[in-house]
Amino acid sequence: MGLRFSRGRRRGGMVSLISVISTIGIALGVAVLIVGLSAMNGFERELNNRILAVVPHGEIEAVNQPWTNWQEALDNVQKVPGIAAAAPYINFTGLVESGANLRAIQVKGVNPQQEQHLSALPSFVQGDAWRNFKAGEQQIIIGKGVADALKVKQGDWVSIMIPNSNPEHKLMQPKRVRLHIAGILQLSGQLDHSFAMIPLADAQQYLDMGSSVSG
């Protein structure tokens, strides 16, 4: 309609120039708006899929660590309306080593079966490695960025140094544990460069926590 209007009337040079500039300006504005909305929609989708889907909606931790009577609290949480899933976990910091390469990482001990109901993390582990992820096998899943920094791949072995303390909370020589890389986690984000997972039962054993957890 606008094209017919512009062709159907004879105008002066200045009026025609203004009309052309206005048309181009409107077209550019609409194009920028479309691109901006597309970028926002893509960002929202990635935010939901790669960040919010892998981060728990809430975490509960005891003031005095480790948490020994967590089972009662877990039972109460699971009874709250709207809670889809809940599970215990252990968080600790370690230093992973492969040859001359070192990397500080945040390690999370999780229950492999329950984690599938809690977050989308298992779906970002390459291949079908999560199916074989279980306690008692000296396994660890590390982020893609950590693997690249250490120059390792799935199937390789790494050493992880874990903080060690006695009952009086005095620091001792770090405990060194040899672990097999069971899988690579690739979220294409910052988490890939500082995160690793091990089975919950193994974390309890390495940290001498018995049946206690962090949260």
How should these model regions be labeled?
Residues G29-M40:
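Alpha-helical transmembrane segments
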Residues G58-A62, V146-A147, S212-G215:
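A short beta-strand structural signal in non-transmembrane regions
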Residues S6, I51, V77-Q78:
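Hydrophobic C-terminal alpha-helix "anchor/cap" residues
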Residues I26-A27, I51-V54, G99, D208-S211:
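Short, flexible turn/loop "capping" segments at secondary-structure junctions
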Residues A39, E44-L74:
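Membrane-interface junction motifs in transport/secretion proteins
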